[in-house]
C-alpha cells in the first residue's frame, strides 16, 4: 500500500519570494522593537561607514556626542562674553564719571588754589622763572606735552580682531584635521586646525604649541578626524604610541557627519565621497547647472543659526528608534501638538457637511463599534 500523499508541495514553504531591486529601499510600515532586519542594517552601516579594528589604542567619539559638546561650549562662551562686556561697560562708566569730576574741579580752580587766576601756558612753565615755575606747574606742563604728542596716535589705530573671529577661550577640546591642506581649505569643521598626517613624520617639532598645551592636560581632549577614518586612525594610533592619553577619533569622520548633520557643523563644500547618493529607483529631480565648489571660510565660532540647525538635527537623530523610552514622550508630544492644532482650528467654520468626511474615517468608526469585524 503506497504512502498517503499530502496535498500541496512542502517546497512552497521554503521557497523565497523574488525581490525587485527597484523597491529594495522601500521599508515596511510596521517595524517596531528589535528585529533581525534592524540588526542586519546596523551591521551593514557599521561596515560601510566605520573601520573598527581589534585592539585600538585610541578612543572613539560619536558625531552626536561631538555636536552636544559643541553646543555646550558655544553657550558657555556666549554667557562669558556677555558677563565680560557688562564688566567692561561698568568700568568705562566709572572712569568717565571720575574724569568728568576731575575736569569740573580743574575748571573751577584753574589748577591752582584760586579760580580767578589764569592758567599759564606750557611755554611759560618751562621758560619763565616767575611764580608759575613750581613743581605742580612743571608737572602739568609735562602732562600737557604728552597729551599733545598723543593726539596723532588716536587717529591711527590698529583694528583689533573681533572676539568672535577667534577660537573659543579655554575650549575643552582641540580639533585637528589630518587631511592635506587643499582638502582642509575646501571643507572642514568649524574651529578645526589643519594638521596633515605627514607632519607626524618630522624629526624636529612634529607638534604645534596648541597640541603640546592640550597633551594629557586635565579636563581637555584632542580630537582627530578625516573623511572616512583611513588617515585619522593611523594618526591616532601613532600619537597614542607616543604618549597621548587624552586622544579621541571622530567616529565615521566627515562621511557620517554629513549624513547626520548636513548643515551647521561644516564650512565649505563637502567632497563627493561624503555626499549622500540617492537610493536606487528613486526619481531624480532635474537641476540646473552645477554650482562651483565654494572654499571654506576662516571661521572659528558657530553662529546662532548654525547652533539652531545642529540642535534640530540632534532632536531628529535622537528619535524613538534609538531609545525606546522616548516613545511615550514623543506620543505625548504628538498629542499636545494635536491639541494645539485643534485649538488653532477653532476659528474655522464648525458647520461642515457630512459629505466632506472621508470614507476611511467612517469605516474605522464602524469597525470600532464592532470589534469582531
Swiss-Prot record:
Q: At what positions is Phosphoserine found?
A: 96, 99, 114, 121
* SUPFAM superfamilies named in the record: Rhodanese/Cell cycle control phosphatase (SSF52821)
Q: Where is the composition biased (Polar residues)?
A: 116-137, 325-334, 347-366
Q: What is this protein called?
A: Centrosomal protein of 41 kDa
Question: What is this protein's function?
Answer: Required during ciliogenesis for tubulin glutamylation in cilium. Probably acts by participating in the transport of TTLL6, a tubulin polyglutamylase, between the basal body and the cilium.
Name the major location. cytoplasm
Residue ranges, annotated region (Disordered): 91-137, 317-373
Result of knocking out the encoding gene: At 10-13 dpc, embryos show a range of phenotypes, such as malformed hindbrain, exencephaly, brain hemorrhage, dilated pericardial sac and lethality. For an unclear reason, some homozygous mutants develop normally, suggesting presence of extragenic phenotypic modifiers.
Q: Outline the extent of the Rhodanese domain.
A: 169-266
Amino acid at each position: 500500500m503506497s504512502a498517503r500523499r499530502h496535498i500541496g508541495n512542502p517546497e512552497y514553504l521554503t521557497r523565497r519570494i523574488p525581490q525587485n531591486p527597484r523597491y529594495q529601499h522601500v521599508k515596511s510600515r510596521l517595524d517596531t522593537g528589535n528585529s533581525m532586519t534592524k540588526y542586519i542594517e546596523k551591521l551593514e552601516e557599521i561596515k560601510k561607514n566605520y573601520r573598527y579594528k581589534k585592539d585600538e589604542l585610541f578612543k572613539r567619539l560619536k558625531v552626536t556626542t561631538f555636536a552636544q559638546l559643541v553646543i555646550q561650549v558655544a553657550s558657555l562662551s556666549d554667557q562669558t562674553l556677555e558677563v565680560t562686556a557688562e564688566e567692561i561697560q561698568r568700568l568705562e562708566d566709572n572712569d568717565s564719571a571720575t574724569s568728568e569730576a576731575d575736569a569740573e574741579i580743574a575748571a573751577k580752580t584753574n589748577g591752582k588754589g584760586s579760580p580767578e587766576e589764569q592758567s599759564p601756558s606750557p611755554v611759560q612753565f618751562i621758560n619763565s622763572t616767575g611764580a608759575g615755575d613750581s613743581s605742580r606747574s612743571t608737572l602739568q606742563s609735562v602732562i600737557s606735552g604728552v597729551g599733545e604728542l598723543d593726539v596723532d596716535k588716536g587717529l591711527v589705530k590698529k583694528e583689533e580682531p573681533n572676539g568672535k573671529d577667534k577660537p573659543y577661550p579655554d575650549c575643552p577640546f582641540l580639533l585637528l584635521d589630518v587631511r592635506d591642506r587643499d582638502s582642509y581649505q575646501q571643507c572642514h569643521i568649524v574651529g578645526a586646525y589643519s594638521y596633515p598626517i605627514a607632519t607626524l613624520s618630522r624629526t624636529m617639532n612634529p607638534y604645534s604649541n596648541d597640541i603640546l598645551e592640550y597633551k594629557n592636560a586635565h579636563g581637555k581632549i584632542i580630537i582627530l578626524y578625516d573623511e572616512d577614518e583611513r588617515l585619522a586612525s593611523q594618526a591616532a594610533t601613532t600619537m597614542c604610541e607616543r604618549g597621548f592619553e587624552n586622544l579621541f577619533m571622530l567616529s565615521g569622520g566627515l562621511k557620517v557627519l554629513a549624513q547626520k548633520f548636513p548643515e551647521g557643523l561644516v564650512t565649505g563644500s563637502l567632497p563627493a565621497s561624503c555626499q549622500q547618493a540617492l537610493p536606487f529607483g528613486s526619481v531624480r529631480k532635474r537641476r540646473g547647472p552645477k554650482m562651483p565648489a565654494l572654499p571654506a571660510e576662516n571661521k572659528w565660532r558657530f553662529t546662532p543659526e548654525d547652533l539652531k540647525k545642529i540642535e534640530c538635527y540632534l532632536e531628529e537623530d535622537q528619535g524613538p528608534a534609538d531609545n525606546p523610552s522616548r516613545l511615550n514622550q514623543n506620543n505625548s508630544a504628538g498629542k499636545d501638538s494635536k491639541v494645539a492644532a485643534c485649538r488653532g482650528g477653532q476659528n474655522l467654520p464648525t458647520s461642515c457637511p457630512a459629505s466632506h468626511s472621508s470614507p476611511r474615517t467612517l469605516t474605522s468608526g464602524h469597525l470600532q463599534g464592532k470589534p469582531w469585524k
